[in-house]
């Protein structure tokens, strides 16, 4: 997989920028707040239709405009493809593949695959469970584009069910009895159906990722530490069986019925899943040093790269955003050695001193200043 061409129009602080990539390794050099991360964010959007930095499209559009455009041409083993993404301040999006507008966003996904590694990824260990769920879901979207639809279905059911629970709670607080609970039973069934699809896929992808992450972690730590990853679904289940998982959902919903009515919200489902990271059987979040936490995240990212390559059949893009500054020299070398020329890599930095001369000689260096890129 090779990204040949990128064109940004009114995206973030880029009014108009065209880039042609002529090397497997591209270094984006510049001071902070010049637009280096914005460029990687544009590629991330093409790969996942998500930004890990903001949730509103209006934050992605240049202030003086009402819409932004991202265009890319990528070469893959099966041929070349062109992608266009139009973002509007209103929130409405248009996705275009090979000059054909698409009705379904999932038909846009999977053309570009990328792994992003930034200083924000340390929140995977330090932050709350939502960060770890988002990480897992972003990986799943690239491995199985249909998952974006599965996740949307679940979130829609969750919103509707929460609205009903809120109404039930409101009426009970007013001293009224909510008469017809059959509607809630219907939402229970839909939550179990859509939620089981989410949780089963999360469990499967983590099962494939764990041995890869453990191998990388062993290599980086010099076999001195044992990494464990544990998926803790909110609804525990034993066998990967559709009916069995759905029954487990309905059983737990029944046991938590009173709590849900009192709180006016759903307390059962994959929106409350957790992923635990353990180092030598101790929680990495509480007991891991900064160095151990960085080693863990580096191992996860290298495992993501490896898993994507195994499943899609070619190396994905690697986007490194100010990550070298977060790693010591030994871990920097581990990362750069793992990359070599295997993955097309875009890396942001404020200075070139972190790179060996052989890296610089084989890299294309762009200077970034106030939303302009100079060759």
UniProtKB/Swiss-Prot annotation:
Keywords: ATP-binding, Cytoplasm, DNA damage, DNA repair, DNA replication, DNA-binding, Nucleotide-binding, SOS response. ATP binds at residues 30-37. The keyword Protein transport does not apply. GO terms for cellular component: cytoplasm. One of its GO terms (molecular function) is ATP hydrolysis activity. Gene3D superfamilies: P-loop containing nucleotide triphosphate hydrolases, RecF/RecN/SMC, N-terminal domain. GO terms for biological process: DNA replication; DNA synthesis involved in DNA repair; double-strand break repair; SOS response. InterPro entries: DNA-binding_RecF, DNA-binding_RecF_CS, P-loop_NTPase, Rad50/SbcC_AAA, RecF_2. SUPFAM superfamilies: P-loop containing nucleoside triphosphate hydrolases (SSF52540). It is found in: Cytoplasm. Its main location: cytoplasm. The RecF protein is involved in DNA metabolism; it is required for DNA replication and normal SOS inducibility. RecF binds preferentially to single-stranded, linear DNA. It also seems to bind ATP. Belongs to the RecF family. This is DNA replication and repair protein RecF. It comes from Microcystis aeruginosa (strain NIES-843 / IAM M-2473).
């Amino acid at each position: 997989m090779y990204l040949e061409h990128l064109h940004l129009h009114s995206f973030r602080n880029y009014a108009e920028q065209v880039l042609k990539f002529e090397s497997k390794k591209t270094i984006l050099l510049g001071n902070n707040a010049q637009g280096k991360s914005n460029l990687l964010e544009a590629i991330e959007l093409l790969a996942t239709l998500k930004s890990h930095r903001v949730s509103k499209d209006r934050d992605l559009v240049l202030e003086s405009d009402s819409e932004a455009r991202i265009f890319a041409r990528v070469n893959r083993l099966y041929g070349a493809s062109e992608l266009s993404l139009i973002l509007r301040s209103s929130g409405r999006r248009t996705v275009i593949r090979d000059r054909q507008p698409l009705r379904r966003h999932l038909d846009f996904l999977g053309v570009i695959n990328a792994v992003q590694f930034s200083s924000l990824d340390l929140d995977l260990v330090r932050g709350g469970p939502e960060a770890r769920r988002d990480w897992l879901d972003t990986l799943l979207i690239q491995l199985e584009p249909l998952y974006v639809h599965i996740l949307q279905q679940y979130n829609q059911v969750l919103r509707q069910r929460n609205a009903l629970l809120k109404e039930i709670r409101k009426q009970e607080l007013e001293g009224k009895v909510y008469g017809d609970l059959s509607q809630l039973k219907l939402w229970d069934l839909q939550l179990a159906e859509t939620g089981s699809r989410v949780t089963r896929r999360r469990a499967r992808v983590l099962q494939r990722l764990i041995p890869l992450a453990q191998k990388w972690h062993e290599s980086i730590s010099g076999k001195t530490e044992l990494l464990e990853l544990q998926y803790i679904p909110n609804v525990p289940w034993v066998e990967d069986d559709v009916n069995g998982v759905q029954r487990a959902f309905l059983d737990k919903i029944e046991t938590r019925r009173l709590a849900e009515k009192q709180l006016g919200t759903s307390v059962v489902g994959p929106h409350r899943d957790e992923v635990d990271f353990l180092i030598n059987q101790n929680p990495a979040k509480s007991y891991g040093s900064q160095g151990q936490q960085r080693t863990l995240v580096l191992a996860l990212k290298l495992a993501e790269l490896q898993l994507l390559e195994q499943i899609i059949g070619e190396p994905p893009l690697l986007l490194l955003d100010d990550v070298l500054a977060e790693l010591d020299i030994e871990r920097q070398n581990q990362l750069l050695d793992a990359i070599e020329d295997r993955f097309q890599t875009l890396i942001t930095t404020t200075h070139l001193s972190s790179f060996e001369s052989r890296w610089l000689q084989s890299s294309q260096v762009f200077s970034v200043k106030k939303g302009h890129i100079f060759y």
